[in-house]
Curated annotation (Swiss-Prot):
Gene3D superfamilies: 1.20.1270.10, 3.30.420.40, Actin, Chain A, domain 4, Substrate Binding Domain Of DNAk, Chain A, domain 1. Keywords: ATP-binding, Chaperone, Nucleotide-binding, Phosphoprotein, Stress response. The modification Phosphothreonine is found at residue 201. Residues 604-622 have a biased composition (Low complexity). Induction: By stress conditions e.g. heat shock. The gene is dnaK. Belongs to the heat shock protein 70 family. This is Chaperone protein DnaK.
Length: 641
């Protein structure tokens, strides 16, 4: 069995790790970086860029560069959070036929967020394969603890599209706790809090790490969070401030200019990062836009104090879930041994200060906030693969699950913070006399009124024997697997008729759509391979042409015109072939030129009485093959990263 890799599929950055020699380690990508921007771009010539190369060209291609799509995954277009995001991104977000939020390129090609995420997962998969030297097919992927069922399903679908069998979906704070806890050599029992403020989501989990009969047990006591609170929101506050200041000064609203918006996004992110270590920075964007009077430049000073005032409300928003999680766990802040910070946004001093004030203790600084989650996912992969022993992980469901009952009431069957996997059943009855069928409406959330909770699915149980209302007994059973994904069944206890469903949210991709996307991804991988082979053939042909021209310059005067004529003709044919996309033609014309080059050297050698004047033309090209391959690798990595 191959390695089960661990992937932190982040809103802003992603990271991949494996178990290596009994320890989890992060793998560097083809650019030598330990994290990869979760950005995908589509260029005019149809090329797909992922990671750093996509980020580099974002300013010149804003409408076709997709970032932070994790905030859209598993969501409806009409969700308030999605509507809020539309105002802040330069690319198009639109409604799919089933009401889901999808994205579109400037030429109106529609894509699901799962497809975009799959491109990032493919990059992570390839990073692991390059390091291991073998094919990777299995992964543990992390999600925010507060992701609902639809968002978890959508993440699994993204894995399938990327060619991965997702063995487990694991919550990000739990993964970070695994990475932290396994690193501790002692067997001391401790209760810890993981405060995870990432690029797009916020989670807080209270976790007990205990030694039980020689086994390290990680039990999640409570979790809470906000799936639309993260570094992107901090960036947006800075962008709004810069836009308002520029509008006051110049009377121009930069929100209407996608190119300016993308430049502002980059500048806001840079300024925010700089202000974690500096007290003041300057946002300087020359030629940010223009009007009838000429080009306009943006130059605004931003202090740390101003940034903190802009995001103060967001930081406060992250503290309330901490209070709820502690309360749900039945603990006080004094019961907590350690506070672990995860996610890039926790590097902000004001965030660290707020966490310190609430929990009454300094958070740990020895956990890498960008890598801990991927390391934990790799450890869970090791547990599933049998490489890591004596570790037991007990996670929880973040939100209550239940059904809609008479009067629009939400009746909970499984309460939030229940350890998973778990099963629970409850018996219900009919609301009308002689009712022969019931509709089971499955929901997730905490509100008493069903309509305010997240609708997961509806299904019918028919064939109930006619009887007065209240007499038939319908048993509804909920079963949550280790991924936090729900299976529901309804059974008439008298007739034993049963209806079972694995919850596939009313939103989400159909099996046909997933199959199409998997096929598209496979086709693209084949296209990429062909493209690489074509570029390699062109590079080798180019080296051969260079070597042959050098040979003509050096030895042309020593041989007859007919020999030179054949070489020149072969050169012209190869140069023509190189302008096309036929790899076989380029290779065939290269062979003809090699043979013509050998004739040139043979003739020159004969003129000099049999002494070879130098390497043959074929070898002149071949001698550089390794160099050309290295050049190609760099080009490929830059363009395909």
């Amino acid at each position: 069995m191959g390695k089960i890799i661990g992937i932190d599929l982040g809103t802003t950055n992603s990271c991949v790790a494996i178990m290596d020699g009994g320890k989890a380690r992060v793998i560097e990508n083809s650019e030598g970086d330990r994290t990869t921007p979760s950005i995908v771009a589509y260029t005019k010539d149809g090329e797909v860029l992922v990671g750093a190369s996509a980020k580099r060209q974002a300013v010149t291609n804003p409408k076709n560069t997709f970032y932070a799509v994790k905030r859209l995954i598993g969501r409806k277009f009409t969700d308030a959070e999605v509507q809020k995001d539309i105002a802040h991104v330069p690319y198009s977000i639109l409604a799919h036929d089933n009401g889901d939020a999808w994205v579109a390129t400037s030429d109106a090609k529609k894509m699901a967020p799962q497809e975009i995420s799959a491109k990032v997962l493919e990059k992570m998969k390839k990073t692991a394969e390059d390091f291991l030297g073998e094919k990777v097919t299995e992964a543990v992927i992390t999600v925010p603890a507060y992701f609902n069922d639809s968002q978890r399903q959508a993440t699994k679908d993204a894995g399938r599209i990327a060619g991965l069998d997702v063995k487990r979906i694991i919550n990000e704070p739990t993964a970070a706790a695994l990475a932290y806890g396994l690193d501790k050599g002692d067997n001391k029992d401790r209760k810890i809090v993981v405060y995870d403020l990432g690029g797009g989501t916020f989670d807080v989990s209270v976790i007990e790490i205990a030694n039980v009969d020689g086994e390290k047990q990680f039990e999640v006591l409570a979790t809470n969070g906000d799936t639309f609170l993260g570094g992107e929101d901090f960036d947006n506050r800075v962008i709004e401030y810069l836009v308002e200041e520029f509008n006051k000064d110049q009377g121009i609203d930069l929100r209407k200019d996608p190119l300016a918006l993308q430049r502002l996004k980059d500048a806001a992110e840079r300024a925010k990062i700089e202000l974690s270590s500096a007290q003041q920075t300057e946002v300087n964007l020359p030629y940010v836009t223009a009007d009838a009077s000429g080009p306009k430049h943006l130059n605004i000073k931003l202090t740390r104090a101003k940034l903190e005032s802009l995001v103060e409300e967001l930081i406060r928003k992250s503290i309330e879930p901490c209070r709820v999680a502690l309360n749900d766990a039945g603990l006080r802040s004094s019961d907590i041994s350690e506070v672990i910070l995860v996610g890039g946004q926790t590097r902000m001093p004001k965030v660290q200060q707020a966490v310190t004030e609430f929990f009454g203790k300094e958070p740990r600084k020895d956990v890498n906030p960008d890598e801990a989650v991927a390391l934990g996912a790799a450890i869970q992969g090791g547990v599933l693969g049998g490489d890591v022993k004596d570790v037991l992980l007990l996670d929880v469901t973040p939100l209550s699950l239940g059904i809609e009952t008479m009067g629009g009431v939400f009746t909970k069957i499984i309460e939030k913070n229940t350890t998973i996997p778990t099963k629970a059943s409850q018996v219900f009855s009919t609301a009308e006399d002689n009712q022969s069928a019931v509709t089971v409406h499955v929901l997730q959330g905490e509100r008493e009124q069903a309509r305010f909770n997240k609708s997961l699915a509806k299904f019918d149980l028919s064939g109930i024997e006619p009887a007065p209302r209240g007499l038939p007994q319908v048993e509804v059973s909920f079963d949550i697997d280790a991924n936090g994904i729900l299976h529901v069944s309804a059974k008439d206890k008298k007739t034993n008729k049963e209806q079972k469903v694995e919850i596939k949210a009313g939103s989400g991709l159909s099996e046909e759509e997933i199959a199409r996307m998997v096929a598209d991804a496979e086709a693209n991988r084949e296209e990429d391979k062909k493209f690489q082979e074509l570029v390699q053939a062109r590079n080798q042909a180019d080296a051969l042409i260079h070597g042959t021209r050098s040979a003509i310059t050096e030895h042309g005067s020593k041989v007859g015109g007919d020999v030179i004529g054949k070489v020149e003709a072969a050169l012209a044919d190869l140069e023509t072939a190189m302008k096309g996309d036929d790899k076989a033609q380029i290779e065939a014309k290269s062979k003809v030129l090699e043979e013509a080059g050998q004739s040139l050297f043979a003739a020159a050698s004969a003129e000099q009485g049999g002494a070879a004047p130098g390497a043959d033309a074929g070898n002149a090209g071949k001698a550089q093959d390794d160099v050309v391959d290295a050049e190609f690798t760099e080009v490929k990595d830059d363009k395909k990263s």
